[in-house]
Amino acid sequence: MKINANFEILETTLRDGNYIVDFGFTSKDTSNLAFILEKAGINMIEIGHGLGLGASKKIKPAAASDEDYVKDTKNTLTTAKIGMFAIPNIASLEDIKKAADLGLDFIRLGVDIENTMLLKDFIKLSRKLNLITYTNFMKSSSVNSIKFAEYAKIAEDFGSQMIYIVDSAGSMLPRDLKQYIYDLKTKINIPFGFHGHDNIGMANANSILAFENEALHVDTTILGIGRGSGNASTETIVSILQDKYGKLRSINSNYILHIAQKKIEKLLGLQTSKTLSEAFGLASVHTMYMSKIINFSKDNKVDVFKLVKAIGNLDTVNCDEGIMIKAFNSIKDQNNSDEIQHLDALKFFDG
């Protein structure tokens, strides 16, 4: 296992997640969620139309223009970097220039393998504009791992600063991804990242494997929302990397769980909380105790996510009244009511 010391997640709820609302995120939705992601400690945030720059004009209109997405989000943030996706033949060079002029920090150039040569002018301009420039090879598994690495080398020679393995079909097993990573690292001298989809339930596992094999970034979305079966889950990946690997300590994972429950579950119209199930899994606490723990948290006005985690730290088999009281006493001074009230007050996805 070799971990990149500069590893960060790249949060793409506001771009890939835009698919699930038919590109309906407004610029207000985008800037508000970006604001609370930054507040949670996320440093890299991708925004905009699911198909990237220019797609509103050429494919299907989004709820906001590319310019408004960038301008409104940039004006809201103080430290986090924002980026957008761009597919040559959908996006134009002028689209990238306009976005850069408005303060875009990074650009992710998406191409199918057979269109690699289209990258040259886009990479050249993006680098000239001082954008952090990534190449995302969509449908990476359409060629074998050796051929993939050869095309990645071409993108590096054009000036790309990072190569993304993109499991567009969500079909890769961990052993497949490991081979792509191995062959890629023998060919290029720049970092790599991974963007997974969850069609066969491998997005989280593959993202962790990429992390363990020196990826600079893996892409995540809150609750895994995204095109098709979705992506790796921000709250799950952050919590696992914090608890099992001691990484991403600057991110407030508990706050992200609340974002997932209070905002994204509402957006999805979920009747049963997926976030709570994730929290129980992360804490190794059986969901047979869920009702009991929820009721205890309400009666004692304690954060349910913190309570579940504290219970898991004490006992992953039993959950009687004594265990819950002991867990409660261990966290009762960890007050986060102000930040959660702030989250409740921030209106988006609902006007």
Predicted regions located by residue number:
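Catalytic cores and adjacent flexible loops of soluble metabolic enzymes
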Residues: M1-G351
